[in-house]
């Protein structure tokens, strides 16, 4: 038991024998914490080939991420959009920055996708910003979701997600607590 004084060994042993006693002491292991919070293990983090891609939605067939209104400016957000040929605001360059992380660069603007905020709220909006590979908010990794699809997770531990699961064009694409949903 970490941070406990053993001035009365019998009390400590009584607490350690029952789950309710452990809860009173605040003792838990990672498995117990995950079970209590209802967390599940996600797929394996994988390396992906660098290149230019569209970031397609599994939830909404024929749709993917694009920069809102095809803007070039820093601060422009990401939205869901019907995929169209030759729309550079729907294409993103995936660039390895080491340690399994990548920058995701909007082809039309050359700016990096960045989760806005510290991620502590469980969600963050995504904007394009000047590229700075040192920023945690611009670091992304890919988690195998099976069937050739991936969850894209920020270094802030939130995953790219369609806001409220609404699949209409123009709906916000943001990061949200990784929940293994489409």
Feature locations, PLM:
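Active-site-adjacent mobile loop/cap segments within catalytic or ligand-binding domains
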Residues: 1-44
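Lectin-like carbohydrate-binding module/patch detector with strong preference for beta-trefoil
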Residues: 45-182
């Amino acid at each position: 038991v970490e941070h406990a004084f053993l001035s009365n060994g019998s009390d400590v042993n009584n607490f350690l024998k029952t789950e309710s006693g452990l809860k009173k002491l605040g003792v838990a292991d990672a498995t117990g914490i995950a079970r209590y919070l209802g967390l599940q293990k996600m797929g394996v983090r994988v390396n992906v080939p660098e290149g230019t891609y569209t970031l397609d939605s599994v939830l909404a067939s024929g749709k993917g991420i694009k920069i809102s209104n095809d803007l070039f400016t820093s601060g422009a957000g990401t939205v869901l959009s019907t995929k169209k040929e030759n729309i550079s605001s729907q294409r993103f360059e995936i660039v390895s920055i080491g340690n399994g992380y990548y920058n995701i660069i909007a082809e039309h603007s050359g700016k990096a996708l960045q989760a806005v905020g510290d991620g502590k709220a469980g969600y963050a909006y995504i904007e394009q910003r000047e590229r700075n590979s040192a920023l945690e908010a611009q670091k992304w990794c890919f988690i195998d979701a099976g069937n050739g699809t991936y969850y894209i997770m920020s270094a802030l531990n939130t995953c790219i997600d369609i806001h409220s699961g609404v699949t209409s064009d123009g709906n916000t694409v943001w990061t949200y607590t990784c929940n293994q949903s489409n």
